[in-house]
């Protein structure tokens, strides 16, 4: 089995923690964590989802230039483990989150004003170096204040925020009567505004102090994030990380080029269309905990990987036949992929990682 006695372990863990949920996590704290997820993923979606279409159709960048700008996500993910190590040792996670959101907003404001490749590339890379670590930080903060098996239900509000980002497009097109939104720099300005609001709310989050004594210091292994690789001594976790590495390659291609493909197919309201996947994700995140309990981590991850195959088969068939509804199938199964494979993997990582390495372990997962 992928994890020895996995189903029984999860059932025991879930049962024990459900009994302490109300004592460990008050209603106020739960609202704060849900709001944190909502804002963090709204600010991601509002500018990143339509970026490829803006670069290719409005700025008329070369294909290789578009690819380089969009590689900023991978570059930014490299900072995740390092920021996680800092959070584990030196500063409260919610304070780091607030600072990173302010910096992300500032770089987005600069990026929105650029029209040539080099300065735009620089601004987007700097923005993603600040933004990508926030995804693992929000997971660490949430699972520090609620049982990890309940994390999918907190994380669901990130999906709500992602879907809600479409409201900017709706307001621009139907209330302000602008001729375009997704193909302009307006999403970057909207993303910056959400960043600043999120940073203010971050300062009200429950205190999440470092889990390691400052006197322990920080090594080169910690700075590079390599310390978290020690978790891969566990054969089960090693298999999981290899599968994650392989699965994330096509997954990122969907996020990076999805808006460009839909723009080429003349789909209207690209952000809203892609958000259908997040609507499905909201449903599957609600039931992810139950699936983990009944099926175990191994089967949950397998279900998610099967959904990956369905997605890309649908996109291939849609491209070959010209039938757009195949694209919608590929978009909707996003909920299965994200809820079962990626969020299930975050829960697994939190259970495997020792206390002093939880933030760094989540950072490593997001780096992959």
Regions found by a protein language model. Name each.
Residues 79-92, 173, 284-297:
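Helix-to-loop junctions at the C-terminal end of transmembrane segments
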Residues 68-85, 275-287:
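Central cavity-lining transmembrane alpha-helices of secondary-active solute carriers
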Residues 125-157:
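Cytoplasmic helix-loop-helix junction between adjacent transmembrane helices
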Residues 38, 107, 117-134, 245, ...:
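Hydrophobic core of transmembrane alpha-helices in multi-pass small-molecule transporters
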Residues 18-27, 205-241:
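Juxtamembrane intracellular "pre-TM" segments in multi-pass secondary transporters
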């Amino acid at each position: 089995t992928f994890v020895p006695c996995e189903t029984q372990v999860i059932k025991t863990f879930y049962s024990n923690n459900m009994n302490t949920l109300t004592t460990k996590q008050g209603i106020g704290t739960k609202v704060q964590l849900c709001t944190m997820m909502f804002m963090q993923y709204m600010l991601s979606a509002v500018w990143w989802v339509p970026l490829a279409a803006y670069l290719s159709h409005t700025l008329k960048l070369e294909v290789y230039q578009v690819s380089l700008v969009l590689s900023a996500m991978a570059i930014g993910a490299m900072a995740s483990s390092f920021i996680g190590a800092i959070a584990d040792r030196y500063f409260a996670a919610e304070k780091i989150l607030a600072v990173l959101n302010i910096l992300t907003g500032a770089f987005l404001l600069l990026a929105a004003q650029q029209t040539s490749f080099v300065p735009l590339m620089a601004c987007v890379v700097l923005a993603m170096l600040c933004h990508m670590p926030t995804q693992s930080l929000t997971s660490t903060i949430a699972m520090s204040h609620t049982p990890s098996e309940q994390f999918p239900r907190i994380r669901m509000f990130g999906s709500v925020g992602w879907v809600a980002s479409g409201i900017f497009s709706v307001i621009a097109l139907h209330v302000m009567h602008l001729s375009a939104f997704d193909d302009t720099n307006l999403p970057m300005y909207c993303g910056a505004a959400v960043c600043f609001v999120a940073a203010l709310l971050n300062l009200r989050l429950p205190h999440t102090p470092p889990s390691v004594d400052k006197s322990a210091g920080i090594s080169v292994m910690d700075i590079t994030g390599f310390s978290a690789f020690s978790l891969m001594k566990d054969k089960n976790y090693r298999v999981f990380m290899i599968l994650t590495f392989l699965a994330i390659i096509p997954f990122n291609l969907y996020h990076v080029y999805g808006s460009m493909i839909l723009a080429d197919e003349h789909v209207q309201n690209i952000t809203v269309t892609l958000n259908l996947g997040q609507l499905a994700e909201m449903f599957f995140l609600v039931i992810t905990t139950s699936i983990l309990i009944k099926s175990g981590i191994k089967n949950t991850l397998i279900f998610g990987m099967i959904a990956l195959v369905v997605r890309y088969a649908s996109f291939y068939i849609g491209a070959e036949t010209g039938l757009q509804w195949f694209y919608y199938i590929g978009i909707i199964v996003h909920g299965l992929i994200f809820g079962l494979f990626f969020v299930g993997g975050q829960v697994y990582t939190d259970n495997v990682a020792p206390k002093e390495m939880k933030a760094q372990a989540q950072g490593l997962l997001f780096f992959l």
